Amino acid sequence: MNGNPISSTAISVQMAYQYYIENKFIVNRKYQRKLVWTMEEKAAFIDSLQKFYSVPLFLFANKNIEGVTSFEIIDGMQRLNAIMAFIENEYPIKTSDGEYRYFDLETLSSTKSAMDNGEIIQRTPKLERQLCVNITNYPLPFSFISADEKSIEDIFRRINSYGRQLSNQEIRQAGAIGLFPELVRKVSCIIRGDVSPHDQLKLNEMKLISLSNKRLNYGIVMEDIYWVQQHIITIPNMRVSRDEELIAWILSYMIMGEQVSPTSYTLNKLYKYSISDDENLSTKIEAQIEHLGSTTIQQWFSSIHSFIIDILD
């Protein structure tokens, strides 16, 4: 390898699915956003595979967890989920005859076994077997990197900053270290209802805490989230983490008062914590959070939020 920390190869969809059911794909919630693709976006990606169109690179960080090799997803989480969800019959794709058809579970031995065991139910009408074979044989461009956590988070930020795939708030929050970003994450999760016991999750666990809608039988139904119910934030804006941006503004004002203003420029400063600059706004808010206590501030926010809900109800 000549010291090169990056390796690239083509992995078939079938092999990628095998990695998936072996829980080799890991998601780090410190920088990864939620699963936000709609059924239409997922189906469009599967259609690209069916037509053998070129697709973007999937990027992973090599990890060794308790002696087991796994791959932390840096870029490609939404696409990977689209593949796995389609294979497991969570949604159909539209075919040339105008019908919406589901993956034939008998195409792969692993899905056939899961169907026989009652773990997956075959939905109908089924997609033609040969088309399913074509999809599972598609060579996905996988790239693996060996790097420390700080470098991985930096790579994620750069990919999504230059590609404009994430919103400003998602980029701010991606891998941000400090009491303030962590407080925003925790409070946002509590309000949405997607709290998880730890930051690293298996890819197949992500759908349980991801933003969904009434057509999908899993996740957090966005229509039921406080911000959407009260017409404060629209569903499209929930998908790009505007709720976290709003909570960041509220928390910063609760903690710092009139020292902060509700602007993107201020939020950018709050998320760039630097212990070497005592005059830095992010340093000041970190010191104030440490003084007041993250748990105390979280309780303040939750109490006020509960009071508002009681009034509205």
Regions found by a protein language model. Give the residues of each.
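Conserved aromatic/hydrophobic "specificity hotspots" at molecular recognition or selectivity sites
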Residues: 20
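C-terminal subdomains that position terminal phosphate/3'-OH groups for nucleotidyl transfer/ligation
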Residues: 242-313
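Acidic, carboxylate-rich catalytic segments that either coordinate divalent cations
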Residues: 1-17, 301-312
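Basic- and aromatic-enriched surface patches that contact anionic nucleotides/nucleic acids
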Residues: 2-7, 11, 32-38, 43-256
